[in-house]
Structures are given as structure tokens and as C-alpha cells.
């Protein structure tokens, strides 16, 4: 649930940043334009970091499953040897 809220917040920041950037361009306010670009870029970075974290978590879960399968195979092998 927290991840969903984080992704929502990132999307909201991206939209707000894009709006500030557009406002800065229309009003020729370079500060507002840069603020918007920064906010939008930071939202993108946070989103990419969440994706990377999700990929790492998924990889760790797959590795854990493979290790468990390996232990089960070893257990079965030693059980049959007796």
C-alpha cells in the first residue's frame, strides 16, 4: 500500500512539475521553469528507483525459491540414500 501511495505521489509531483515548468515558460519566469523541471525530474528519479527496488525484490524472491528447491532436492536425495 505504501508503494502505491509513493507512486501516486511521484505522478502528482511529475504533473505539478510539468505545470510549473509550463507556467514559467508562459510568464518568462526562469526560476519557476527550472523549479518545475527539477520537480518533474526528481519525480522521474524516484519512480525509477522504485522500479529498481521492485526488480531487486523480485530477483531476491526468485533466488530464494531456487535455493529452497535446491535444499529440497538435496533432502530428497539424502532421504533416498538411506
Swiss-Prot record:
Region feature Disordered, mapped onto this chain: 1-39
Where, by residue number, does the polypeptide cross the bilayer?
none
Q: InterPro entries under this entry?
A: CsbD, YjbJ_sf
Query: Which Gene3D superfamilies would you find in this protein's record?
Result: Apolipoprotein
Coiled coil segments of this chain: none
Its family remark reads:
Belongs to the UPF0337 (CsbD) family.
- Chain intervals with Basic and acidic residues compositional bias: 1-36
**Protein name listed in UniProt:** UPF0337 protein EF_1180
